[in-house]
Swiss-Prot record:
GO cellular component: ribonucleoprotein complex; ribosome
Annotated PANTHER family: 50S RIBOSOMAL PROTEIN L4, LARGE RIBOSOMAL SUBUNIT PROTEIN UL4C
InterPro entries given in the database record: Ribosomal_uL4 (IPR002136), Ribosomal_uL4-like (IPR013005), Ribosomal_uL4_dom_sf (IPR023574)
HAMAP family reported in the protein's UniProt record: Ribosomal_uL4_B
BP GO terms, sorted: translation
Transmembrane segments: none
Domain of life: Bacteria
Function field: One of the primary rRNA binding proteins, this protein initially binds near the 5'-end of the 23S rRNA. It is important during the early stages of 50S assembly. It makes multiple contacts with different domains of the 23S rRNA in the assembled 50S subunit and ribosome. Forms part of the polypeptide exit tunnel.
Region entry Disordered, spans: 48-72
GO molecular function: rRNA binding; structural constituent of ribosome
Full protein name: Large ribosomal subunit protein uL4
């Protein structure tokens, strides 16, 4: 079980919260997380790359020159893959790259990834009321009060639900990504230096993923 301190808008500790999610065993944890990460990255591929074979390129139905007697190499079509503007040999065609993974395994990987980042996890009180209007400077100052180095570190901010002012305040910060608890994913959990989560968002995560089902 890991215990995280809760910080308010000013960076002062206001309490503690326990994070004790059922995770994979030490022997299988890295592999389960790897499979979930691989699935997410592969499934994000569009798979729409497409090329034309020699039979699909427009033209090339007539033989360019007779077979023998010209002194040139024989050719049957101007759309041969050997020719400029010809077809493509073994080029990509639209395909589905989807990798399936059991729901229980996906949830296990997500819990394991989150629990493994507990040392980089910062829990804060709900601060929607602190941003009356979109103010990037105020959000940056809050991150610094919470102990995050904004100059060189990437941040994942997890909210219970979408907050317009918070989203607009963080929109032009290249090292900050804002997601809701319902969109939690393995890649974001592993790819950032710090994870900042609001108390209500963490409770929703524990409620959703805490039980083994």
């Amino acid at each position: 079980m890991a215990t995280c301190s809760i910080k308010d808008w000013q960076g002062n500790a206001t309490g503690e919260v326990d994070l004790d999610l059922p995770v994979a065993s030490a022997a299988t944890a890295s592999h389960v997380v790897y499979l979930a990460f691989k699935r997410q990255m592969v499934n994000s591929r569009q798979g729409t790359a497409s090329t034309l074979t020699r039979g699909e390129v427009r033209g090339g139905g007539r033989k360019p020159w007779k077979q023998k007697g010209t002194g040139r190499a024989r050719a049957g079509s101007i759309r041969s893959p050997l020719w400029r503007k010809g077809g493509v040999i073994f080029g990509p065609k639209p395909r589905d790259f989807e990798i399936k993974m059991n729901r229980k395994e996906r949830r296990l990987a997500l819990r394991t990834a989150l629990q493994s980042r507990v040392e980089d996890l910062i829990v804060v009180d709900e601060f929607e009321g602190q941003l009356a209007a979109p103010k990037t400077r105020e959000l940056v100052q809050a991150f610094e009060r919470w102990g995050v180095d904004m100059a060189s570190q990437s941040i994942l901010l997890i909210l219970r639900e979408r907050q317009t002012n918070t989203y607009l305040s963080a929109r032009n910060l290249p090292n900050v990504k804002v997601i809701t608890a319902g969109n939690l994913n393995v890649r974001d959990l592993l790819a950032t230096d710090w994870i900042v989560v609001t108390g209500p968002a963490l409770e929703l995560i524990k409620e959703t993923y805490g039980a083994v089902a």
